[in-house]
Regions:
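Non-catalytic cap/lid and distal C-terminal segments of serine-dependent acyl enzymes
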Residues: 1-181
Length: 181
């Protein structure tokens, strides 16, 4: 497994699927450009430098929080690029994201997905992320309905004491790697 970490210029811009304003926070909605850059520039560059499979089933995308959101978004926008998805606490509370998922067609191709969320994520917030757990539950149900390939694998994991913190992101990222690869 070769793992490449990409530091975003601006997570709120690069990793969000469409522009939105929540309270006084502006989100840039540049996820399409980010995913296209990864698919059309980063992966081909890595293939030139390393012996990496040409088969999308061997290529994955992963992220936590907004990184998880953009990784999930990639499933719908670039399903032909990635075969594995690690979604650690993806920010599916993002305005209209669950609605977006409901509007997507069924996914016939094979994908291996690991999704984690802590049961206490957002509980102490008065921001939209207070809906993290119920929005995750709705999104997981939708994804289960959309994944129709008999060869797809979908793991959903949770921790009743889990918070939206790096400690949990690392712990469950390691679990995801062990499950998917």
């Amino acid at each position: 497994v070769i793992f490449v970490g990409i530091v975003p210029n601006n997570r709120k811009k690069d990793y969000t699927p469409w522009k939105s304003v929540v309270g006084d926070i502006e989100y840039g909605g540049q996820a399409d450009a980010y995913i296209t850059w990864v698919a059309d520039a980063v992966i081909p560059y890595l293939r030139k430098c390393f012996r990496i499979s040409q088969d999308r089933k061997d290529i994955g995308i992963a992220g936590a929080s907004f990184g998880g959101l953009v990784s999930l978004y990639a499933l719908f926008k670039h399903a032909d690029t990635f075969g594995h998805y690690i979604l650690i606490s993806p920010s599916v509370w993002y305005p209209d994201f669950v609605k977006f998922m409901k509007s997507q067609p069924i996914i016939n191709s094979t994908h291996h997905i690991y999704w984690y969320v802590g049961q206490l994520e957002g509980k102490q917030s008065n921001h939209l992320n207070q809906y993290m757990v119920p929005q995750t539950e709705a999104a997981v149900d939708i994804l289960n309905e959309l994944l129709v390939s008999q060869t797809s694998v979908f793991y959903f994991d949770t921790n009743r004491k889990g918070l939206h913190r790096q400690y949990y992101f690392k712990k469950y990222f390691n679990r995801a790697i062990n499950k998917l690869f």
